[in-house]
């Protein structure tokens, strides 16, 4: 099968995007894998620090490899939002295909310093591990929000020059810039619109060897997704939307059969709900 780097490069050339979806258990993983097989595209599984603590890094790696073999499609594993260098190193040691060093709350200099340390460790590990970093603050929530958090300033965004300098100074393979996006989903309305021209400028500035990653994809309109991908984003993260679908499917199953106590008889409804969301997103990202 193709490597993650080859998959991302191909997506960039074809102006499509690879979907990245977070999991907390094997049930969600199976729903995502089934959707990717149906659409016929590779997919990336993400596990945040909290999700890694719950699932276990080595277990997440083993589950992902097993799912890729079972479903017959490329499935890759990413250590999502690691806030420490040691966390990234641990994920690399556990066999992850990609890691994200999230240093946006550090000073710009410290963010670059720690990101570069992760890049250097990845280059020496004996495998082709993708290293991603974040540039600009878009919040930390994965919940339904009443409004944009006060600490997220949608107009204070990094420039294309900032993006190019960060890539040059750190050597990252992928960059997730703030472009008007937001972690979490706003209740009853779409998330703020993206700065499409800024994405185009950043794509030009960082070059064709670096993936541009859209975080905070949950809550965006289909039109925003398409415009962002056309402008140069070749990897899209979805998490909150998956969590809402999973919980909703399980709650619906228990409401229909409140006496049910066998987990496999109601958890599968959550899996099916996840599969539906992922299928729709993958079809959109790859069209």
Task: Give residue ranges: language-model regions.
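C-terminal alpha-helical cap/extension of soluble enzyme domains
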Residues: 220-287
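Alpha/beta enzyme core
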Residues: 4-14, 26-51, 58-74, 81-209, ...
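A short N-terminal beta->alpha junction/helix N-cap motif
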Residues: 16-24, 51-52, 265, 269
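Active-site-facing substrate-recognition patch
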Residues: 1
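Histidine-centered catalytic micro-motifs
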Residues: 19-24, 77-82, 209-220, 238
